[in-house]
């Protein structure tokens, strides 16, 4: 360790100790010899941040597409993708998947939005009262989306008119479902289809995570089930060839593991796919009837959340949430007991994102406040506390930088995106030099563990991650520059994931202070009047090239 590095580390420690009663309460940069010591203030409100928090859903052809930047928190959309729109016959190539994806996801990169696609076959089964696809809406999700050259389901179930329930006539007590998921060719066909999805989506920068889907209504892995671990919905016990698809867990587990080497794959239930390292989408958060099937089964996965995303949605149209009188997300969050339960589950399960927010009334002040609290809790929240760096470096000589960052959220960021230190023009804030800190893996910036409900904090606090690097600015004129940090989206190498600090520049960078190259150091403080509000910045984007 060189002398400059030792000096910087010692001064950062002394600075933090001297500011112990005000840590995080203000931004300040101090010059100590040839070292700048920076104390930073946390940005306390919630804000939108890449691949975390409230997740949206818009019914294609029904809900109007966004034509403005999402407000206040959206960075991800759920997209239900009909199988037959991506492959209508076996011979259709991956180009059809790409073409339909482009149609459905047009323009999301300009709003810095990511997609969570879920391929599916059936929206609601006819024996549950499902209605067919609207012929006037080519993208309608309703109905049954079997490829034209695949035999659809022929099931013995009968719908009870006007109700979401079905029955079997006595003569059909052992009658299996024919065709569809149970067709002899289905396993081979679905394996080939998943391979095409991987070819289309595994390197698509628009895709955040991939929900496995395909099986069951909405692709939620029930009706029929993946395994017999849990009783079926429609019958008191499992019946071979009707209530679950024997062996499909291995077929789909192998297919998705092979097709997706880059994107994280999520499945519906924690008790299925035991031999695979998948994330989970639990679509019934905070419902009493799902405590064992959902919540406790997910807890049993242990540290799975450290490498795989945990998400889902809040659904208030059934179970305890409905019986309590909840008819919208606002009702759920404005009920203090329900809000506390959701927050506790987010923290204990290390939740990355939740849906159910699309139609919310953001003018409701209490709802906005509580939605913000959950936004802060979900996913990653990287807070810089202090930093130290070389104040003045001779031309062609290294600048040493070190800083500390803590993840006060509930989950990691799941992809190892580049962490960049840059030098900016002090007037325009344009980047004039950049260095990617290769040794850093931001997926290892982990949150705390073991949530204490009464203390409102993790019993094992999140560790402070100490980062240091040296870089030599090339071809820079002598002068003053702003030294800044940012986490880049590899799609365009533009700032994307943001630090939760008040010292923020429009465009995604976090300025630490001034640094001098080939000149004597002066006042390192950046005027706080230059700082922008994190939540109000609508300039972030990525590229598809």
Regions picked out by a protein language model, each given a short descriptive name:
Residues 1-8:
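Bacterial N-terminal signal peptides that target proteins for export
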Residues 15-18:
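C-terminal motif of bacterial Sec signal peptides marking the signal peptidase cleavage site
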Residues 28-65, 109-113, 209-360:
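Catalytic-core regions of glycoside hydrolase
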Residues 77, 197, 210, 256, ...:
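Conserved, mostly hydrophobic/aromatic
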Residues 153-186, 193-238:
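Active-site groove signature of glycoside hydrolases
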Residues 338-390:
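Catalytic cores of secreted or luminal carbohydrate-active enzymes
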């Amino acid at each position: 360790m060189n002398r400059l590095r030792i000096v910087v580390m010692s001064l950062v420690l002394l600075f933090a100790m001297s500011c112990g009663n005000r840590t995080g309460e203000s931004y300040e940069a101090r010059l100590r010899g040839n070292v700048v010591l920076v104390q930073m203030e946390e940005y306390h409100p919630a804000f939108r941040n890449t691949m975390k928090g409230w997740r949206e859903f818009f019914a294609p052809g029904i809900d109007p597409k966004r034509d403005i930047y999402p407000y206040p928190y959206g960075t991800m959309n759920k997209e239900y993708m009909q199988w037959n729109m991506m492959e209508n016959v076996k011979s259709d190539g991956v180009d059809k998947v790409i073409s339909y994806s482009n149609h459905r996801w047009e323009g999301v990169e300009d709003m810095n939005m990511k997609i969570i696609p879920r391929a599916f076959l059936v929206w609601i089964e006819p024996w549950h009262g499902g209605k067919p696809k609207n012929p006037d809406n080519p993208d309608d999700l309703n109905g049954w989306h079997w490829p034209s050259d695949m035999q659809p389901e022929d099931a013995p179930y009968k719908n009870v008119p006007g109700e979401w329930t079905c029955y079997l006539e006595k003569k059909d007590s052992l009658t299996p479902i024919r065709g569809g998921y149970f067709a002899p060719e289905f396993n081979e066909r679905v394996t080939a289809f998943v391979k095409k999805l991987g070819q289309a989506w595994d390197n698509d920068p628009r895709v955040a995570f991939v929900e496995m889907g395909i099986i069951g209504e909405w692709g939620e892995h029930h009706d029929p089930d993946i395994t017999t671990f849990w009783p079926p919905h429609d019958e008191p016990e499992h019946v071979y060839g009707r209530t679950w698809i024997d062996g499909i867990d291995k077929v789909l587990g192998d297919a998705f593991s092979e097709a997706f080497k880059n994107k994280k794959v999520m499945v519906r239930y924690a008790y299925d796919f035991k031999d695979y390292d998948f994330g989970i989408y639990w679509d019934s958060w905070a419902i009493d009837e799902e405590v064992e099937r959902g919540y406790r089964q997910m807890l049993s996965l242990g540290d799975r959340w450290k490498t795989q995303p945990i998400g889902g949605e809040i659904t208030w149209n059934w179970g305890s949430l409905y019986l309590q009188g909840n008819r919208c997300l606002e009702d759920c969050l404005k009920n203090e007991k329900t809000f506390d339960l959701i927050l506790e589950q987010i923290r204990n399960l290390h939740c990355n994102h939740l849906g159910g927010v699309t139609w919310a009334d953001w003018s409701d002040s209490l709802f906005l406040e509580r939605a913000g609290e959950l936004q802060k809790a979900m996913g990653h929240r990287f807070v810089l506390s202090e930093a130290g760096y070389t104040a003045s470096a001779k031309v062609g000589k290294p600048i040493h930088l070190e800083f500390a960052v803590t993840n006060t959220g509930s989950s990691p960021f799941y992809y190892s995106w580049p962490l960049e230190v840059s030098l900016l023009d002090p007037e325009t804030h344009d980047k004039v030099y950049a260095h990617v800190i290769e040794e850093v893996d931001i997926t290892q910036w982990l949150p705390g563990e073991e949530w204490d409900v009464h203390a409102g904090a993790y019993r094992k606090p999140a560790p402070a991650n100490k980062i240091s690097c040296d870089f030599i600015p090339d071809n820079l004129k002598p002068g003053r520059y702003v030294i800044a940090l940012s986490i880049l989206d590899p799609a365009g190498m533009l700032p994307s994931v943001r630090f939760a600090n008040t010292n923020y520049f429009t465009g995604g960078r976090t300025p630490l202070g001034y640094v001098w190259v080939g000149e004597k150091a002066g006042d390192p403080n950046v005027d706080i009047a230059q700082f922008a509000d994190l939540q109000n910045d609508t300039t972030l984007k990525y590229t598809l090239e």
